[in-house]
Amino acid sequence: MSPQLKSLDEEGDKSARRPTRKQTSRAACPQDGHRAQSSRKDPAKGSPRPGSSRKKQMEHGSYHKGLQGQKPRKVERSLQGRKKDRRTSLKEQRASPKKEREALRKEAGKQLRKPRSTSLGSSVSTGDSLSEEELAQILEQVEEKKKLITTVRNKPWPMAKKLRELREAQAFVEKYEGALGKGKGKHLYAYRMMMAKKWVKFKRDFDNFKTQCIPWEMKIKDIESHFGSSVASYFIFLRWMYGVNLVLFGLIFGLVIIPEVLMGMPYGSIPRKTVPRAEEERAMDFSVLWDFEGYIKYSALFYGYYNNQRTIGWLRYRLPMAYFMVGVSVFGYSLMIVIRSMASNTQGSTSEGDSDSFTFSFKMFTSWDYLIGNSETADNKYVSITTSFKESIVDEQESNKEGNIHLTRFLRVLANFLILCCLCGSGYLIYFVVKRSQEFSKMQNVSWYERNEVEIVMSLLGMFCPPLFETIAALENYHPRTGLKWQLGRIFALFLGNLYTFLLALMDDVHLKLSNEEKIKNITHWTLFNYYNSSGGNESVPRPPPHPADVPRGSCWETAVGIEFMRLTVSDMLVTYLTILVGDFLRACFVRFMNHCWCWDLEAGFPSYAEFDISGNVLGLIFNQGMIWMGSFYAPGLVGINVLRLLTSMYFQCWAVMSSNVPHERVFKASRSNNFYMGLLLLVLFLSLLPVAYTVMSLPPSFDCGPFSGKNRMYDVLHETIENDFPKFLGKIFAFLANPGLIIPAILLMFLAIYYLNSVSKSLSRANAQLRKKIQALREVEKNHKSIKGKAIVTYSEDTIKNSSKNATQIHLTKEEPTSHSSSQIQTLDKKAQGPHTSSTEGGASPSTSWHHVGSQPPRGRRDSGQPQSQTYTGRSPSGKRTQRPHN
């Protein structure tokens, strides 16, 4: 054999003899190197079962004979080291497959990702043209990364992994998105991408800007956190009303007042724009101006100031037509915005679904906003969550409450009867006061109270009747939300009854003034005729026209109606502010500073702090808006005054509610949709339209004031414009459309369409309710399945724990069994282990057990391991030599 082959054989023998890690761990003891090799060569053939008597005999025999001549301490150390090595080897064997799999998975992922990134990076860096397949691959990867960026928030990953994946995806998109523009359209693609990013950023900034521009948002949120959503709903409604009135003010101010002031005839040029001679002395007195007389009466705030010229100024602006169309637009825009708001609220309330399930769980685990970084905001959020819990508790208590239904019905009937008596009495009182004021208007010297008796009585009724209604409503025992609706309806009936009583009495005054205007009209014509035709014989120059202040004029009933609505608005505003100042602020100051020196607890007893009157304030706002809609046609400046009133009311009432009021004793949640307020407002809008439509269509305008003077009816300006400014065929079309034979069928068709849509809406709502019940039933079934499954898992885990505890007890008892046997037992084991050729005396002790002491135990295999461990026992062969036999 050549030397090279010998060297290869030697290397092979060395490599074959080189022990593995597993073999070295088993051969850790000084004397078991040969045993490890024999254990590998001789597998377990007919090895005894664990726990059998044969195995115990072999363990004891090998243990005693193999350790003769060694000290017990060395044996124990070797046994402990052997056990530790075997345990570590088993752990490595178990953990190695998992580690190998993870390593393979990571390497595969790197190999899959590495070629793409390197190829893309090289192609992008070198600037080479990409093929269509590569472009498609890049586009696909970029789209996937973009999709991951948009959906990473919904992934069920830990936050660290989300951030890592998000950064990697953003870096990938920024790096390789430009590779798509390497062809002809590189600059165009880069420009489009830049503009798209800038547009997204602009929309985001604009949305943030719109959110910041919402007026009084933080004030309302602060109020909601302390007083609940029911009080905040009033301020949201007030803000909405302010926006509507701001639009109406823009229409009237921009299309009526400004054109008349800039292009119309100046003040003092005609009688309707001049203060009469008899009123000039006291025209600037405060008492006169407070009553909207003097110079205010003959200003652009009222109907009578505007001229009846068909066109004014160099623009030939048609002011009468603009005045009429703006009046129609006020009602049209208000009707459209109210119905649109109601529709949006209805859609929002139906899209929410059934949120009554798990109310407290949802509030507990999903109420907090983790983006809050301000301590004050956190305090407000804490108070808001507490208030929402109180609202839900009240709803839960009211849904489970039971009582005597017969007593409740009797008390509710009694309460409604008392409130009906109050409504009838207030209506009669207002009618009586208006009739009395007509008598006072004929007198010369009247007091301030007699001049303003109507406004004072109506304001006092609006101030004292709502608390009286609230006291009577305590008998009905309604849910707070239902009680609020009843209270709103009753106060609405009070205000509406008072308003229509006032209008009926005012219409009597209007008819009286119309009859007087005919006389004044004749007197004016004869006066001017005599003035111009009575000239002396020696006069050669004609007389100049009379001064506008000296011309007789009529009563101008439109301006009188506008003045009455202006007085009502201002007096209602002042009474509201005085009520807040005296009834809330001064009351709160008295309770706070006099409580420590009073006979009883002022905070807990009488008078205590005031609660915010939601129903009274809401109905006052709606009632005031109804007066604005009716009076704006006769007083264009009334909308501007109402805008100032709403603006000051927002700040004044926000300050009052935060400084002087306390939350309601029973805090309740407002309705999901604000449609109850909107429904009342829509009804007021319709009822406000009726008097204005009656005056426009039926009553003749004043002959010497206003843009419609000289016409039989106010709507004649529409016919005049159509005849003079439009082609004739359009006039025929408008005349055909105004035919009652066409209008009545159109109205009937509208009613049929409304009925059909209402029936469809009800059927859809019923289907929605049925689907909601089915979803609830499926949820209950799923919950029951989960509970049954959870119980089964708990039962199985308990059984497993019991079985494992029993096994552990058995193992513990086996380990703690004594190893000191009687001499006869040890001798019997030694005989069986040594074979038939070894003799021993009966009753004598074996020489190998001379060192055996209590507490020592023979080596055993691990009972908890999954694989059988090889152990070596020492015995004697039939020839008498010591041999080693593996036992698996």
UniProtKB/Swiss-Prot annotation:
Keywords: Cell membrane, Ion channel, Ion transport, Membrane, Transmembrane, Transmembrane helix, Transport. Its main location: membrane. It is a multi-pass membrane protein. One of its GO terms (biological process) is calcium ion transmembrane transport. It comes from the Eukaryota. Coiled coil: none annotated. Disruption phenotype: Knockout mice show reduced transduction current amplitudes in inner hair cells relative to wild-type. It is found in: Cell membrane. Residues 7-16, 32-44, 87-110 have a biased composition (Basic and acidic residues). Pore-forming subunit of the mechanotransducer (MET) non-selective cation channel complex located at the tips of stereocilia of cochlear hair cells and that mediates sensory transduction in the auditory system. The MET complex is composed of two dimeric pore-forming ion-conducting transmembrane TMC (TMC1 or TMC2) subunits, several auxiliary proteins including LHFPL5, TMIE, CIB2/3 and TOMT, the tip-link PCDH15, and possibly the PIEZO subunits. This is Transmembrane channel-like protein 2. The lineage of its organism: Eukaryota, Metazoa, Chordata, Craniata, Vertebrata.
